[in-house]
Swiss-Prot record:
Organism: Pongo abelii (Sumatran orangutan)
UniProt EC number: 2.3.2.27
Region (Disordered): 245-266
Record's protein name: Non-structural maintenance of chromosomes element 1 homolog
Family: Belongs to the NSE1 family.
Stored SUPFAM superfamilies: RING/U-box
Biased composition (Basic residues): 256-266
Organism lineage: Eukaryota, Metazoa, Chordata, Craniata, Vertebrata
InterPro entries associated with the record: Nse1 (IPR011513), Nse1_RING_C4HC3-type (IPR014857), PE/DAG-bd (IPR002219), WH-like_DNA-bd_sf (IPR036388), Znf_RING (IPR001841), Znf_RING/FYVE/PHD (IPR013083)
Molecular function terms from GO: protein dimerization activity; ubiquitin protein ligase activity; zinc ion binding
Gene Ontology CC: chromosome, telomeric region; nucleus; Smc5-Smc6 complex
UniProt modification remark: Ubiquitinated.
List of residues that carry Phosphoserine: S251
Catalysed reaction, written as an equation: S-ubiquitinyl-[E2 ubiquitin-conjugating enzyme]-L-cysteine + [acceptor protein]-L-lysine = [E2 ubiquitin-conjugating enzyme]-L-cysteine + N(6)-ubiquitinyl-[acceptor protein]-L-lysine
Main location: nucleus
Amino acid sequence: MQGSTRRMSVMTDVHRRFLQLLMTHGVLEEWDVKRLQRHCYKVHDRNATVDKLEDFINNINSVLESLYIEIKRGVTEDDGRPIYALVNLATTSISKMATDFAENELDLFRKALELIIDSETGFGSSTNILNLVDQLKGKKMRKKEAEQVLQKFVQNKWLIEKEGEFTLHGRAILEMEQYIRETYPDAVKICNICHSLLIQGQSCETCGIRMHLPCVAKYFQSNAEPRCPHCNDYWPHEIPKVFDPEKERESGVSKSNKKSLRSRQH
């Protein structure tokens, strides 16, 4: 199987191995996705020229289209790191998590999601989430059990925990953006720059528009005196740093668990 014989919309062993490993991880940063791609070529088609990542993924997506599955690219809300996740397009509801969680666990996630969406900060405190345990559908759940389930959501990359508070992982945003828009139309927040769903971000104190932190960083990158893109009033928040993939490559360090990635590359 040489590179010259590969055609668009044809899944080779390289593509199949890549897809299988991405499914295992659920979501990966771009740096790890590129490493995974190189690994798959090394195993199955060592002499082939490695396709550009965008072309490689588009090829897979063209085959997956009929199955209503897609590899989607997004960015982390806190620092703008590119991520990729395998997304089920056939359903937009939380039911896509049903294979991994019981009914009462899914309802706990739904309660946590509501708190996160309704909050101004994009976070829901563990205390507030656990206080809703008595309202869950299905089998009764103790607070100690609920704490363990929340950690399971974190391990499966549906939630992120920071200092006792929870927010949505980039995987959850990629998978559930349409569901969130449809279910919480009055509470949902949209970024003024990229117009996609916003969970965490900054807002203008004058007109109220919101921006993702990475969008804030890029928009005000060269502005000595940042002003709101909507009302032109002074932007009072600290401007975050722009994620630099070049520096990331130089350091060779990713936030994700490299050991875990290597252990699953087989």
